[in-house]
């Protein structure tokens, strides 16, 4: 590959690139370096360029995680029962972030495209507050009123999980998350379930 050998002078930049069998010098007024992060060393993104730039007098912000999953302290039941289960067609909201997509519940927490998209604001909140509390709409194509009306129907002898599946189509990991985060006394209240 190509590696930077030297850089910098007060009248612009002189950069030397060394490639197999040749060397090239480039004079530039400005240089944009696309060097990758520090999380995939086996693919070349090892972050070693940070120290090189600092030694050359360039101010470099610390590398921070991005496009990453997050740890969640699940109950043993959720961790064992729903590890690897996808949450599809959900809307994740956090501050000004609001996006529909999908992600996966893992034993350690959450990961997947929707989580990666929200990773920067979630990371910043965790750095500032020690935690991030997000909102998840598991039925984004249904109105609050429709959900309340359907969930208010008598469930008879059916379990609450069966009632949720029959009336509004919630099942599996989505019901597992409701059990995980809703107080038991509110789990049978249609208005709270629809919120």
Feature locations, PLM:
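Residue-level recognition of phosphate/Mg2+-coordinating polar/acidic sites
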Residues: 16, 30-34, 40, 91-195
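Acidic, Ser/Thr/Pro-rich intrinsically disordered regulatory segments
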Residues: 71-102
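Internal, well-ordered alpha-helical segments in soluble enzyme and binding-protein domains
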Residues: 45-52, 78, 86-88, 100, ...
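Glycine-rich loop(s) and the adjacent beta-strand/alpha-helix scaffold that form part
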Residues: 30-76
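Short secondary-structure boundary/hinge segments and terminal tails
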Residues: 5, 70-72, 109, 123
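Short, acidic/polar N-cap/turn motifs at the starts of alpha helices
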Residues: 1, 12-14, 23, 87-91, ...
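Conserved beta-strand-loop-beta-strand element in the redox core of flavoprotein oxidoreductases
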Residues: 2-26, 31
């Amino acid at each position: 590959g190509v590696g930077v050998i030297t850089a910098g002078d007060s009248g612009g930049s002189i950069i030397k690139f060394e490639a197999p069998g040749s060397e090239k010098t480039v004079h530039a007024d400005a240089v944009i370096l696309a060097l990758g992060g520090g999380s995939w060393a086996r693919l070349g993104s090892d972050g070693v360029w940070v120290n090189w730039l600092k030694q050359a007098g360039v101010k470099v912000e610390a590398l921070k995680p991005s496009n990453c999953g997050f740890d969640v302290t699940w109950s043993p039941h959720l961790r064992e029962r729903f590890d690897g289960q996808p949450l599809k067609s959900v809307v994740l909201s956090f501050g000004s972030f609001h996006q529909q997509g999908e992600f996966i519940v893992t034993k350690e927490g959450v990961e997947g495209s929707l989580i990666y998209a929200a990773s920067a604001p979630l990371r910043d909140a965790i750095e500032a507050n020690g935690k991030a509390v997000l909102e998840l709409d598991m039925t984004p194509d249904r109105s609050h009123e429709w959900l309340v009306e359907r969930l208010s129907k008598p469930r008879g002898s059916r379990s609450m999980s069966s009632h949720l599946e029959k009336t509004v189509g919630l099942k599996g990991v989505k019901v597992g998350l409701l059990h995980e985060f809703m107080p038991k006394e509110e789990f049978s209240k249609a208005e709270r379930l629809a919120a």
